[in-house]
UniProtKB/Swiss-Prot annotation:
HAMAP family: Ribosomal_bL36. One of its GO terms (biological process) is translation. It comes from the Bacteria. It comes from Blochmanniella pennsylvanica (strain BPEN). InterPro entries: Ribosomal_bL36, Ribosomal_bL36_sp. This is Large ribosomal subunit protein bL36. Coiled coil: none annotated. It holds the Pfam family Ribosomal_L36. One of its GO terms (molecular function) is structural constituent of ribosome. Keywords: Ribonucleoprotein, Ribosomal protein. The keyword Ribosomal protein applies. Belongs to the bacterial ribosomal protein bL36 family. The keyword Ribonucleoprotein applies. The lineage of its organism: Bacteria, Pseudomonadati, Pseudomonadota, Gammaproteobacteria, Enterobacterales. GO terms for cellular component: cytoplasm; ribonucleoprotein complex; ribosome.
Amino acid sequence: MKVRTSVKKLCRYCEIVKRHNVIRVVCRADPKHKQRQG
């Protein structure tokens, strides 16, 4: 899980999700692409 000020989709499988007012990126293909805004 990377914590970044600006989250971006890193591949075509990445999805931007908003949970509890935190923007996250989840990826089905590569778990290393997981990010959250912080």
